[in-house]
Structure formats: C-alpha cells, structure tokens
C-alpha cells in the first residue's frame, strides 16, 4: 500500500471485516483500543493511505475461477487468498492432494496471466504443531503439489505456550526461487498490533 500497489485480500478463514481491522492496525502500528479511541484521527488517514489501495472481501464458497475473473477485470497488483486450500475449483479429483495441486497450478496461472503477485495462505499439518521451523514438507494436505507451484514458501513456527505473552516466532524460508536464500529468521510479534519485529 505504501508503494501504491492495488491489493486484494480474499478472506475465507476469518471474517473479512476482522482481517481488515487487523490490517489497519498493522499499517498504523496501533492496538484495537487505540484505533477505537482515535477514530477521528485515523479515519482520514485510512481514506488517504489505505482505502484507495486495499480491498478485503469475503471469499467463503468462492472458486479460483472467480478469483481469475476478478483479476482480469480489476487488475490488482497483489492478491492474497486466505486460505487458498478452501477455494473451490472445477473438475473431479480422486484425492484431495490432486485437487490442491490443481488449485495451486491455477493460482500460478492467474499470477502469470495477470502479471500480479499471488500470495497463497495455508496451514501447516499437525507435524508443524509446536515446531520452531515449519518447512514446506509440513504444509497441510499436500504431497508435493502445493510446494511445486510456489516460488517462495515461508513458514511461521512457534514453540511453547499459546499464551499471549509468548511473542517469539520463527520464520523459515524453505523454498526460494526468487533469490535462492533459505533459512530461519527469529522474530517477535506484537500480538496487539499485528506487527513482527
């Protein structure tokens, strides 16, 4: 947004409005309470810095074909699909991993055809629970199909309690066709603001 890119965030995991508020908090580096207490201050800033560039929409029950049509019509620069695994796709598949592979192939084609960055959000399988480093072998419900279609895969791991005070996260780049760098990065999350440091 700060660079002037048009961004679309398709939400089918959490309600779209909740995601949008979280993105606004993150953009301004503020808590939900600070946002609510200072709406007159942030409303014009939102209209200037976020509203022209960001659309957050519900994607419950949506297909990748509909995402493709939207991209052709509206020409965004970046699209997030959270979670891409839950998007429908035409065709019949014998196994879930075959359907997922085809979904990710289609997503890659959307990116190429429309010259946009396509960011697919997915979950780790149970293998990733309480793990420091989440690599692409731990992606949920996939053999190699999802990983094969991605240019970069970033896993976010966490160990220890689920308590809000556990702010350490481990970011693991396990595939990188962009510049080849792989490895872990330790970070801290400000849970109240949705910002990593």
Residue map of PLM features:
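Anion (oxyanion) recognition and catalysis
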Residues: 1-2, 112
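Cytosolic-facing regulatory segments adjacent to core modules
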Residues: 3-75, 89, 184-187
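Structured core elements
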Residues: 8-11, 55-56, 80, 120, ...
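A short beta-strand-to-loop transition that corresponds to the Sensor-1 phosphate-sensing loop
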Residues: 13-14, 83, 116, 120-125, ...
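Short, active-site-adjacent cap segments at secondary-structure transitions
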Residues: 17, 86-88, 125-128
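Flexible beta-alpha connector loops of hexameric P-loop NTPases
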Residues: 33-35, 55-57, 88-101, 130-137
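C-terminal regions of RecA-like/P-loop NTPase motor modules
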Residues: 64-79, 106-114, 126-197
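Helical hairpin unit composed of two closely spaced alpha helices linked by a short loop
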Residues: 77-120
